Amino acid sequence: MDITITPLASSTLWSADITPTTCSENLLDWLLDQNSLTRKLQALSADFKVKVRQQVTLSHSKDLLSPYFSEENKVLVREVLLVCDNKPVVFAQTEIPFSTLTDQQAKLAEIGTDSLGTFLFQDPSMRRDKIEVAQFPVYSAVHQLCIDLNQEVDFPLWGRRSLFYVNNKPLLVSEVFLPASGIYLP
């Protein structure tokens, strides 16, 4: 069986440096917000849900996955859409090394349609590393996803990613704001 994940880590350049002139102030607020994206989206919509696109185990591949876990033999990759009022607004991809999936963190592999953000932000041991941002050019894999979701777009999209630590065990969360998110409006 062929497994195809959206190559977020390998398809663009991620950077912790972003200037206000690079994007709008509204977009910057969304990209650099350290708080729970789940809570923010829930506050802005009447109906919030998580739609799991896929969850797969991969042997580490530098072509598909981030360099953060290159020493890991296996990584769990979870791809979801965050949906507000029946519109997908964020595509999220999480990389969880198998070494993280021990003890209390083993349940990360079984959260299904529950929000990972809710799990993370309720855990008192959680800490978040710096936020990195990336711009996805037109014709990228992310844009193909938008077409598949009937959200065609002719401008670059933005995403962010952070390493999170739960009981000092790492996982990487990447989030791309889709056109229906409304954050690209002036």
UniProtKB/Swiss-Prot annotation:
It is an enzyme of class 4 (lyase). One of its GO terms (molecular function) is chorismate lyase activity. Substrate binds at residues 78, 116, 175. Pfam families: Chor_lyase. It comes from Psychromonas ingrahamii (strain DSM 17664 / CCUG 51855 / 37). The gene is ubiC. Belongs to the UbiC family. This is Probable chorismate pyruvate-lyase. It is found in: Cytoplasm. Removes the pyruvyl group from chorismate, with concomitant aromatization of the ring, to provide 4-hydroxybenzoate (4HB) for the ubiquinone pathway. GO terms for biological process: pyruvate biosynthetic process; ubiquinone biosynthetic process. Its EC number is 4.1.3.40. GO terms for cellular component: cytosol. Transmembrane segments: none annotated. Pathway: Cofactor biosynthesis; ubiquinone biosynthesis. Keywords: Cytoplasm, Lyase, Pyruvate, Ubiquinone biosynthesis. Coiled coil: none annotated. It catalyses: chorismate = 4-hydroxybenzoate + pyruvate.
